[in-house]
C-alpha cells in the first residue's frame, strides 16, 4: 500500500482497462494508494493488480493498469482491479477506463472521468467533465463548468457554473444551476428545479419540467411529452407556447408589456404530443410564506 507525503493538493492520472476506482478526499498531508484484484480468487486479476504501476513525482500521481488483450474481448476473462485512493481535498483527478466506475467522496478540484461502461459519482468538485458510454452519473455539487455525456440516469444537486448535459437514454434531474444550461436527451425526461440563467432543455421522448426559471430565456422542447415551466412571482413573461396534440395551460395573470430595462422572462415551449403548462413557481410561493 504505497503512501506518499503530499502536504498540498495533487494531480492524479488514472489509466485502467477494467476496474473500479474509489477516491476519498479530506484534510490530510499524505496520499495512500491501494490496488487490489477485483476477484482475489482469479489469477488474472491478481496478476493485473501486481503489475499496476503506481508512481508519484513532482505533485502528480500516476496509476496505470496493464492492458491485456482479454480486457477488450467478450470471451477473454477481463483482468480487473480495484483502486482505492485517499488524498488531500482539492486535488485534481483525471481517469479513463474501458469498463469501470469512479466514485469520489469529499471535495476534489478539477475532475475528468471517461469510461466505456460504468457509473460515476461525485460528492463535490470544482469542475467536472464526465463521459460514460453507458452508466449513471450522480453529482452533489459542482463549483464550476460542467460537461456530462452518458446513457443512464443523471442526478445533480447543484451546479454553480455553466452546464452541458447530453443523455442518450435515461432521465436527467438537476436541483439548481446558476450558469447557462443546455440539457439534451434522446430518450428520457428532463427536470430542473431552479435555473438562474438561460436554460435550453430538449428531449425526443419524455417530459420537460423547469420548476423555476428565474431569469431566462427558456427553451423547453419535447417531441413526445408534457412541458411544465414555473416563473417567479411578479416577473412579467413573454410566451411562445405550441403543442400539436395537447392543451396549453397559461396560469399567469395578464400583465402589461414590461417597460424599458424591466426584467422579464422569455419562454419558448414546444411539444408535438403533450400538454404545456406555465405557472408561477412553487418556490416563489414558499419564499413569500417564509418572509
For each feature predicted by the language model, list its residue ranges:
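Intrinsically disordered, low-complexity terminal regions
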Residues: 1-291
